């Protein structure tokens, strides 16, 4: 079987294969900022291998709450169809248009959720989302806000029943009425 690998040690706004959408930008430190750093806005926002058995990634990020400890809405690492466009903001993390399970939107996301929406547990958590924002698996997580860099390593099996032949790999983050700033490193 053939392996595909890529690594970003820092980011450049003119970098090949880096698609910045909505509020995302690369700052002067080479950090990818996924949400605006400022006043909150209401409701703001591979390759196929037929024997693919799992997907592995590692990344680091910072979540900060400049004006409050009540932060919304979170960060998601996702695999989705290549033509994926930003969806609803706020609790939908820019990935989904509603709460319905939609097999036509073949996607997998790992969310670092900082706000309890009506479909979420009443705690910050890490969730595994397949074709819907309603997590299939949830682990409570005490989110650390501020300048502390958090590290994530993800290993999970990928089903060809969930993902299309080609996918876009990316990050999405949104804020709602409560401000939050998300950076990946």
From Swiss-Prot:
Disulfide bonds: none annotated. Binds one manganese (or another transition metal) ion and one calcium ion. The metal ions are essential for the saccharide-binding and cell-agglutinating activities. It comes from Vicia villosa (Hairy vetch). Belongs to the leguminous lectin family. N-acetyl-D-galactosamine specific lectin. Binds the Tn determinant (GalNAc-alpha-O-Ser/Thr) of the tumor-associated glycopeptide. Could be required for agglutinating cells such as Tn-exposed erythrocytes. Ca(2+) binds at residues 113, 115, 117, 120. GO terms for molecular function: carbohydrate binding; metal ion binding. CDD domains: lectin_legume_LecRK_Arcelin_ConA. This is Lectin B4. It holds the Pfam family Lectin_legB. The keyword Glycoprotein applies. Glycans are attached at residues 48, 122. InterPro entries: ConA-like_dom_sf (IPR013320), Lectin_LegA_CS (IPR000985), Lectin_legB_Mn/Ca_BS (IPR019825), Legume_lectin_dom (IPR001220), Leguminous_Lectin (IPR050258). Homo- or heterotetramer. V.villosa isolectins are composed of either two subunits a and two subunits B (A2B2), four subunits A (A4), or four subunits B (B4). The predominant form, isolectin B4, has no A1 erythrocyte agglutinating activity. It comes from the Eukaryota.
